[in-house]
Regions:
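An internal, D/E-rich "acidic patch" concept
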Residues: 1-54
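Membrane-water interface segments at the C-terminal ends of transmembrane alpha-helices
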Residues: 7-10, 74-103, 118-123, 129
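Alpha-helical transmembrane segments of integral membrane proteins
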Residues: 31, 35-68, 84, 104-218
Length: 218
């Protein structure tokens, strides 16, 4: 057993993860072929999460926040509570309404649009709450009161004065959210039947292809 473990570590140092029991191909080659799809989905999901998170955060600190705050807080809470698998099924049903299964619109949305939207929506809630907390702290700063005294309108005050100081905690959160999004690709790729490391992991476990599953986990 120790000899086998030593051989495994030696192969791991050479990026030799063995061969697939199902196809006979090297595991490293199989993983390398699927990795670009997962990276593309994770980056697109991160962009969606940032856009939605900042939008919800800005809406929650508007002058008329009595109307926008409940909506923004509700959407952020829903994003944090709704499972990716459930929101993915809802997104598929919505995508089918936009066009027949073979239309170009439906193919585009199923290819990257809907998976990225579902994946990014699951992370936008935490970003929105952090943006709102940072901007509320910044809005109470003396320089914001000075900008208001100079007659700067609320919209420009939010964008040019309050948003930039509130970016620091969000930037530190991006690394955590990126790791979360990579983990979320397992469910997203499986729900949307999209190629990638997540779908490869699920299929290798179901097929009993343990070298591939082991290589993905490592």
């Amino acid at each position: 057993l120790l000899h086998q473990y030593a051989r495994f570590l030696a192969g791991l140092a050479r990026a030799d993860l063995g061969d697939s029991l199902y196809t006979g191909q090297p595991v490293a080659r199989i993983i390398g072929a699927q990795m670009p799809y997962t990276v593309q989905l994770a980056l697109a999901g991160l962009m969606v999460a940032l856009v939605l998170g900042f939008l919800l955060g800005l809406l929650s600190v508007r002058d008329d926040q009595r109307r926008t705050l409940p909506v923004a807080a509700g959407v952020a809470g829903l994003a944090m509570a709704l499972p990716v698998a459930f929101s993915g099924v809802l997104a598929i049903l919505l995508g089918l309404r936009l066009g027949p299964p073979g239309s170009s619109t439906a193919l585009l949305l199923r290819g990257l649009g809907l998976p990225a939207l579902v994946l990014g929506f699951s992370s936008c809630g935490a970003i929105a709450r952090l943006v709102r907390a940072g901007m509320q702290e910044t809005l109470a700063a003396p320089f914001m009161l000075a900008a208001r005294a100079r007659g700067v309108r609320h919209g420009p005050r939010l964008i040019w004065h309050a948003l930039r100081p509130a970016l620091a905690p969000v930037i530190s959160l991006i690394a955590v959210e990126a790791a979360f999004l990579f983990g979320g690709t397992v469910v997203t790729e499986t729900v949307f039947s999209r190629p990638g490391l997540g779908r490869l992991l699920v299929s290798s476990i179901l097929q009993g292809d343990f070298p591939v599953a082991q290589g993905l986990v490592v």
